[in-house]
Amino acid sequence: MAMPLTTAIDAWDKRWATVEGRADWLDPAPDVIALLPELKARGARTALDLGCGVGRHALFLAEHGLIVEAIDGSAAGLKFARETAQARGVSLGLQQATADALPFDEGSFDFVLSWNVIHHGSLGDVGRRLAEIWRVMKPGALYQGTMLPTRNINYGRGRTIAPDTFVVDGSERGHPHFYCDAATLVALFAGFELLSLTQQLHRKPGSWHWHIIAERRPL
């Protein structure tokens, strides 16, 4: 059974509702910017930003000519993304939804982005979300995303609620976080061809993340 994301969505709602909470989440990640030429070279037209937050990546992709759908569980994040898109004259398809049941047809997208999203849950949750992502991608489409390695400084902190899955109660990490080694990640991406797999630091010391680029394999 999938772990509920209620606590995570509540936390993001509170964060996205304030100027201070949004401040670090307004600019697209450098890796996403860097992938744009490859998307253009492949003729990508349709994109899904899965867990779009306040819309930083969805807006970037749309402003560079892609037809973008974006989902998030946070109403506050979607509200800010919608208002920003209107202010910039950018067209975005925005829906309140989660990665557990994507509201799109099979083979809808040339590109799916999932930045700091799918690891909120257990190993089984991540596997089900990747199956949903695979379903809505066209054969040969690109996936870009992040996950958490066991090298991350927060691995093992808090309550263990499933293998390699932890919750730190009373903190911003008060919802499940799943961590994995390279072998587990490769197994999770069995339906994809991994094109790039690196570990990179994010904002804080020890905040290692997997950075993934993969191509959807055909049936």
At which residue positions do the language-model features occur?
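A short acidic, Gly/Pro-enriched loop at the edge of an enzyme's catalytic core
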Residues: 100-112
